[in-house]
């Protein structure tokens, strides 16, 4: 079924013909929701497959390859920093687990059966190694899938489209209406203030010597602050673009500066994208 739709003229000029740009914003949001649900369900091996799938999808996009490659490198760098942070946490866990294991095995020596002692030692070693690997890899995969899926949606969907999608949602638009612009700007200001205040508190307490932290915890704390700064700066930049799009939407509504174009409301490719994405996650879940 076809219909006429009022959209801004600048959005009409910025439309692209690549396959991922033609996917509706609602379907992209649905796929991102499936990705976030899979984070809490799938194992780290399946999450690796999802991360590689996201990278493969980004290389199939012909337009804006320089922008996509730049964001991919930024996300990989942030993922590496997350891996370093989780690796330091995993080392602390390993040291603690080894101490607990040595204490437990020393108590187990009292038993006369040596085979049971050997079995306990092997079982604990395997459990520590498996937990060490999961603690190191899973947070990095969580971070990469979450951030890069958002980036792909933001790159391949203009802020105007996201604003129109939000505007079509009666519940969201009824709650926020034009105040959504104020919420985005306020959230950006709050996040920036929190980052600056945390940084100042750490600097002052470190200079005064009142920050009593172990040396093994100081570096992970600084790495986490660096990751949060890079992550929130990206969020702030994207929220400003969405806020500008909201301002443009309100201005276009007041000036009636819209272009009437003939668009298709829904077609077979949209349904096919939903079916393929759902089957992809079902197959991974059952594998």
Swiss-Prot record:
GO terms for cellular component: chloroplast membrane. Its main location: plastid. Belongs to the ycf92 family. This is Uncharacterized protein ycf92. Keywords: Chloroplast, Membrane, Plastid, Transmembrane, Transmembrane helix. The gene is ycf92. It is a multi-pass membrane protein. The chain crosses the membrane at residues 32-52, 72-92, 133-153, 175-195, 216-236, 266-286. The keyword Lipid metabolism does not apply. It is found in: Plastid, Chloroplast membrane.
